[in-house]
Regions:
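A short glycine-rich, Lys/Arg-flanked "PGG" loop and its adjoining helix->strand segment in the class I
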Residues: 8-22
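Short, small-residue-biased leader/transition segments that mark boundaries at the very start
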Residues: 1-2
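Conserved S-adenosyl-L-methionine
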Residues: 64-75
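Short, glycine-/aromatic-enriched active-site segment of Class I SAM-dependent methyltransferases
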Residues: 27-44
Length: 108
């Protein structure tokens, strides 16, 4: 939530219109504490999907589309799976299918 509400708006405000962004979506910080599993790990793929979609939706509202989405090949130290979004202006809005593919191809 912090990324969507504070970091992304600040990045958009200080960059040129042709800037590209490569952001890491960390579901453990996006889904809310009450939805975390043991050790702070997001195990439910549906919650991971929701985190990706929320960051992409926030980016879209700021004029950024998603050029690409992929899972990080390395899980975080606690086992969280994280995702990279390539954002840029004039790119398309993220489709659920593209996000689901990233989740299915990432670490389990």
């Amino acid at each position: 939530m912090l990324f969507r509400s504070l970091v992304l708006p600040a990045l958009v405000a200080v960059t040129t219109s042709d800037a590209d962004f490569l952001v890491m979506v960390k579901p453990q910080f996006e889904v809310g504490r009450e939805k975390l599993g043991a050790g702070g790990v997001v195990r439910d793929p549906a919650l991971r999907l929701a985190a990706i979609e929320e960051v992409a939706r926030s980016a879209w509202e700021m004029g950024l589309g998603v050029e690409g989405v992929t899972a990080s090949p390395l899980p975080g130290p606690s086992g969280n799976v994280e995702y990279f979004l390539w954002l840029r202006r004039a790119s398309a809005q993220l489709s659920r299918e593209r996000a689901e593919i990233a989740i299915s191809q990432g670490p389990r």
